């Protein structure tokens, strides 16, 4: 469970770089259709959902794994954010958590703190899920006496503002006191939401927010997603109704802007938000030029290429677990590597001092192994290696403590 928690933190950090890019692009693409903003938030969702990503030279994500999944077991815990300024601030703090070298049996405090943070995260997730369930139940009770107006449109005396409720079979709920002209425009707006599948995207956004609730940028992204969805829907309705009905549509928006607290509080209901901004957007709406749409789409494709991929690595960090109570012997990496340049270059990584290092071909006997070479911290050792052969890296270590020790080697040309 701790590894899952750290994986989610890493995914959230990677998505944060994308969120920052989207915040900037929302300002740059003011003249673009609002659905472009929604598409950009969709790219953020993909980054948050997919645990795996391809490597690309185009990637603008500084680091694919900021926090090592085994950081709590590391002799010297460090992060790799891909930004030296951040590393220089955070890593000295993390190093202070490491037990002194002369206290061999002391546990890494991160082994205590990470499970505690994991529990806090789970409590937060549970609280938001409970909040969603309770608010949805309260809203369902509020409309259980609603009367069918026509089709999937219902009216209720307990409703003061229109909204869409439901994911599989969405229903439109309206107050009884709406006049005919406002009702026509409001129904057009809510039906546009359903056609655009917005009643799917808002719950999905809130689900991702529930998982990544610890990230402040996720809260900002969710608020802006809801606003951008409304603005995109308004543009769609104005395009269908025509400019001559723009003033009447704005009047309907204003009429729906009161007493909507109950709707806004339910993540599974789709009510009207940001009415002032929406009225201003409707007043200033102009059909975007074709070239603006083309540029916006190209930018979205570029954003996906740069932020849905991980940075291409030319050096990898491999983990070696030194068992508790072990005598001096060679211990090997869990991962296997294969050369791409007829040689493998090795550096001493975190927790590993000067020692012997060995390149060992997998599925071969010990007699076919390479000769051990002394590895000095800060300097590299290079082994000639056959192509199409997989190797493990071994280091000569001992561990007299009662806890497993994790050390790292860095390899290149693999």
Regions found by a protein language model. Give the residues of each.
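Hydrophobic membrane-embedded segments
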Residues: 1-130, 134, 167, 275, ...
């Amino acid at each position: 469970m701790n590894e899952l928690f750290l994986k989610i933190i890493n995914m959230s950090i990677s998505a944060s770089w994308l969120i920052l890019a989207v915040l900037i692009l929302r300002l740059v693409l003011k003249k673009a259709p609002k659905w472009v903003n929604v598409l950009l938030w969709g790219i953020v969702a993909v980054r948050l959902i997919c645990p795996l990503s391809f490597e690309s030279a185009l990637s603008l994500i500084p680091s694919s794994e900021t926090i090592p999944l085994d950081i709590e077991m590391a002799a010297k815990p460090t992060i790799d954010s891909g930004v030296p300024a951040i590393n220089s601030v955070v890593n000295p703090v993390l190093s202070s958590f490491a037990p002194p070298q002369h206290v061999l049996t002391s546990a890494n405090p991160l082994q205590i703190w990470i499970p505690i943070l994991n529990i806090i995260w789970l409590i937060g997730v549970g609280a938001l899920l409970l909040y969603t369930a309770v608010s949805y139940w309260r809203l369902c009770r509020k409309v259980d006496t609603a009367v069918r107006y026509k089709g999937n449109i219902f009216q209720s005396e307990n409703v003061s503002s229109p909204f869409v409720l439901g994911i599989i079979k969405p229903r439109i709920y309206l107050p009884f006191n709406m006049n005919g002209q406002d009702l026509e425009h409001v129904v057009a707006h809510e039906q546009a939401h359903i056609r655009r599948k917005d009643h799917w995207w808002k719950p999905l956004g809130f689900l991702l927010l529930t998982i990544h609730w610890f990230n402040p940028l996720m809260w900002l992204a969710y608020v802006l997603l809801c606003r951008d969805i409304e603005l995109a829907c308004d543009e769609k309705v104005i395009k269908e109704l025509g400019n001559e009905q723009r003033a009447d549509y704005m009047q309907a928006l204003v009429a729906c802007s009161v007493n909507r607290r109950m709707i806004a509080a339910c993540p599974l209901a789709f009510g009207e938000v940001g009415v002032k901004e929406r009225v201003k957007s409707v007043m200033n709406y102009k059909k975007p030029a074709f070239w603006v749409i083309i540029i916006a789409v190209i930018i979205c494709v570029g954003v996906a290429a740069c932020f849905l991929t991980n940075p291409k690595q030319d050096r990898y960090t491999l983990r070696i677990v030194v068992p508790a109570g072990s005598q001096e012997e060679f211990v090997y990496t869990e991962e296997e590597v294969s050369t791409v340049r007829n040689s493998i270059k090795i550096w001493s990584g975190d927790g590993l001092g000067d020692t012997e290092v060995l390149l060992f071909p997998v599925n071969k006997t010990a007699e076919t192994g390479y000769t051990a070479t002394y590895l000095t911290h800060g300097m590299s050792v290079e082994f000639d290696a056959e192509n199409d052969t997989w190797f493990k890296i071994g280091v000569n270590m001992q561990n007299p403590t009662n806890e497993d020790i994790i050390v790292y080697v860095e390899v290149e040309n693999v």
